[in-house]
Amino acid sequence: MPTTTDPSVTLRRGGLTFRPATLDDAAFAADVATATHPDEPEDPASWRHWWSTDDPTWTNERFIVLRDNTPIGYARHNHAPWDLMKKRYGRIGFDLLPAERTDAQLASVFDAMEERAHASGTRIFAAYARGDDEWLARWLLAHGYREERRSKAWLLDLVAQRQKIEEMAAESRAKMRAAGITIQTIDKDTDSEKFHKIHEMSEEAATDVPTTIPHVRQAFEVFVRWFDAPTVRLDRMWIAREGDDIVGISVLSYPPTRGNVWTDWTGTARKVRGRGVARALKLETVMQAIALGVTTVRTENDGENAPILHLNEQMGYTPIPGWTQFLKDATG
């Protein structure tokens, strides 16, 4: 199987055509995702960067879905290299324009993507529905999928919670100073090895996030492309340093043209957990967002990640719809 979609592969299912997507289709895919969830606009430049920075060792196939030669959505499947996976999990994703979200067309999309994924070696399909998308959840449950786990998403009102956040930040700054931990943005760090250190620490943190599909280590050459994303800047990416070690990071994603501000990634080294480092980092990111005039920020975490969920509650976050993961046995 190719790691990206073979341009010669065109699929047809149930009156729909699936043509291989190119980077130039990323903006359309972002538009479709925005139409599906208007409260969560997706940024076209961000999607193009996402598509352009795929790990070359993974299998990634993306298609534009057409009905009567008219684009109505996109669909994809991907998976890590099988020699790095104990079980052959593969993810299936899609978005259709709201008027095109019918049971029949959804069945055609999943038939096509499941067939491609299975041919690539996937034996457990993973699909996702937002917590308030009852139609999609019902469809998945009726077609052999079962609910596996849920994430929790949160919104923080920076206007209503500003005083509380400022007080918490002052307390955390004092605590970090007393502990000898420096909190600063990446651009101010002069260590020539800082990006490699952030990579190693992030890999350690990602490995410990509760999940069903195991985290697969990312090569530094792939990881470092994150810093070129249009949603992040080095002067808005906060790190924690203890001596020579970088022991934590927290980053907000700022879409350049449209979309909400979300936590992109927060992680800490095992050796500093329980010492308030994640709290200090997250508080600096939202303090900076306040200074930039942002009024709300959002975050999402696995529903079993108790420490970070507790921190979200302390900071004043309120729940919004998260995502539900569904799995389907494809060994038959």
Predicted regions and their residues:
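Short loop/turn motifs at secondary-structure junctions and domain boundaries
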Residues: T53-T57, D228-R233
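Extended hydrophobic/aromatic segments used for targeting, binding, or gating
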Residues: V247-T266, R273-L281, V286-Q288, L292-R298
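Acyl-donor-binding surface of acyltransferase catalytic domains
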Residues: M1-L11, P98-T190, T324-K328
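Conserved acetyl-CoA-binding loop-helix of GNAT-fold acetyltransferases
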Residues: T102-E115, T268, G274-M287, H310, ...
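Short amphipathic alpha-helix that is part of the acyltransferase structural core
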Residues: P2-W51, W58, I64, E171-R217
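Active-site/acyl-donor-binding loops of N-acyltransferases
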Residues: H143-I165, R236, M287-G332
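Conserved donor-binding loop and adjoining core beta-sheet/short helix segment
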Residues: T22-A26, A33-G131, R241-A269
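Hydrophobic residues within well-ordered alpha-helices
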Residues: W139-L140, T263, L311-N312
